[in-house]
Amino acid sequence: MEKLYCGMPLLLLVLLLASIDGSTQLQSSQSQTLLRLQQLLYYPKVLNSWNNYTDFCNSEPSPSLTVVCYEDSVTQLHIIGDNGTHMLPKSFSINSFVTTLVKLPDVKVLTFVSLGLWGWLPQKINRLSSLEILNVSSNFLFGPIPHELSSLATLQTLILDENMFSGELPDWIDSLPSLAVLSLRKNVLNGSLPSSLSSLSGLRVLALANNRFNGALPDLSHLTNLQVLDLEGNSFGPLFPRLSNKLVTLILSKNKFRSAVSAEEVSSLYQLQHLDLSYNTFVGPFPTSLMSLPAITYLNISHNKLTGRLSANLSCNSQLMFVDMSSNLLTGSLPTCLKPSSGTSRDVVYASNCLATTNEDQRPVSFCSNEALAVGILPQRRNKVSKVGIALGVTASILGVLLLAGALFVVLRRLNAKKTVTKSSPRLIRENASMGYTSKLLSDARYISQTMKLGGLGLPAYRTFSLEELEYATNNFESSAFMGEGSQGQIYRGRLKDGSFVAIRCLKMKKSCSTQNLMHHIELIAKLRHRHLVSVLGHCFECYLDDSTVSRMFFVFEYVPNGELRTWISDGHMGRLLTWEQRISVAIGVAKGIQFLHTGIVPGVYDNNLKMTDILLDNNLAAKLSSYNLPLLVEGLGKVGQVGSRSGPKGTPSIKDEDKIDIYDFGVILLELIVGRPLRAKSQVDVLKEQLQASISADDGARRSMVDPTVHRACSDQSLKTMMEICVRCLLKDPLERPSIEDVLWNLQFASQVQEGWLQNSNPSSNLGSPSPAASSLPPPSRLHVTTLESPRDSGCEEHER
């Protein structure tokens, strides 16, 4: 009996433990909060398993959905949607979403990726006082990074990648003392980095790639824990930055660095594994010690102007697996450790240097020497030479070149005097038709995002054409190839030897310019490539024999076969008109073209004088802008700095609203897409705008009475109302009140989604005009306009007060 009594406490303890549920039970209020989030996110597929009976804290985690609880509260919530998720409907409220999140007071980690979230990140985000990790990447959030984030003292990771955040990186960033990861890739952030960034001693990852940041970098050597620095695709420069010696990954590609690569800085990076300095203008000697850094595995210095003489006995780290040193000014021999015979499997690219190899892609040594002189750098020599000797050598070389040039000039003048013609024959083509300029023109791709590169457009690389090629394409510019003449020259339709059609614009130069003076403008023009622009494929210079100045320029454009947009709206292209869905798609294409002109290249191209007749349609009915403000067309030379400087109704310069002039022009185009008839006067635009404004607040019938009769029964009311609202906002008199191009795009995409859903749920009785274009073997001529800075406005619609 005594033994039984002694065992009773142990038995009671076992029974007590068995009676306790081994699982964590979430508070009912927090369960309701999670279900409310599901509702606010419009029931995404990833949350299909959630219902009133879900045991959230004990659900099986997955890569796309995880809920972590501690005791009876949610501490982590990870929701990852599908790639390419559309924006949530217009009724979505980011404020309501964050207000609901605040009801999870103990949450430390939030991940909301690819869920279609949109709007300004609200100020009440600071109520998530326990937050340590916030990841809202791959959504549609915009506006500045809210100051209220600075009060989240425990925040360690902030990831805002692939959104539309704008403005500068705030200087309050040092108010986050625990911040270890800051990733803002693929937004539209701009300005220089604040010096306060240097105070984040705990920062391990700084990723700012593919934004619009510029200027010199602050001193980063104090970030003693920084391991990853990714600044690709901005405009940082010109000096090589001061860095922490604990970096593992350093990416500075596609920026505006123009200094030497500091050998002292890089030689101390003993943990560096990945180094990418490509597509800059780094000059001076290439620090060969980079190849033998103790941890280096990836090295890319391509497309710079680095000099130096390589030797076969240079050493490489045995772990180095990838090296790209192409398109520099390197001489000497390829190091043995980089050759395939060295026994190590490495990817090595070294074309377009001046190396002594059997590779046919090398240039002559004289080329690298001359280019080095052009950038103020002398190639390294084996033996040490005094500064005085170098100076004397350079001086003698310059004098020799000047004497030779003078003698050649005298000879040419005498020969020219013997000619019987009164004017020099402009037949000297100073460039060969080749890909020779491609590297120079397109290597500077730091202003263009990866998705806008050549391969994705299906276009050939920008190149120089010979006059013979253009004469062949147009049958010596015969009249049958003539398409028209505007203020900027004649346009011909041509067919190249490969069978592709092109549009060729011929410009007679009104001022004396050498080819060298024009190359800066050519480099800008070569970058204007986008799916929704009529892109330039190349150029040709024709020069006078006597002084080699350019007499004529030819620009070769891609050919757009389906003609002007207006013929598909009001004129009835071959008896067909665009459907409502196609009109929305065209509007989205035009907006994307404008967005690229404003943000896809630096400096942006503004004040493009866009008109309905400037929008062309390709075989897939994709819209292409054929008129944009190129600085190099006759009168525009020497005025590049004034691009986009005019603003608003009064024509006064303003940096803040320079993009809003194109927004007004877009509003006029959108108005014509809606009403379906040509608008050729400002008075028409003003009257229709007022009618549109009144119909928005009226009933459905009033709105449909404004629409092109051929499509007014084939559009949903919400889609139509959204299009009308954004159109009226674009036409506001005050430029500052007009929407941004990102706002325009959001509304157009929302209208498209609403229309798509409406079509799926109904069978409209009138869906007139479903074009099915077929390109003929010789497409009809399409108009091509390229606007200069000082050119008179083309006819077709009088210039509106913008």
UniProtKB/Swiss-Prot annotation:
Residue ranges of every copy of the Protein kinase domain listed in the record? 477-759
Q: Which residues form the signal peptide?
A: 1-26
Source taxon at top rank: Eukaryota
Q: Disulfide bond: is it a keyword of this entry?
A: no
Please list the residue ranges that the record marks as compositionally biased, kind Basic and acidic residues: 791-802
State the LRR repeat positions.
71-94, 104-128, 129-152, 153-176, 177-200, 201-225, 227-244, 245-268, 269-293, 294-317, 319-341
Any notes on this protein's domains?
The protein kinase domain is predicted to be catalytically inactive.
User: What's this protein's name?
Assistant: Probable inactive leucine-rich repeat receptor-like protein kinase At3g03770
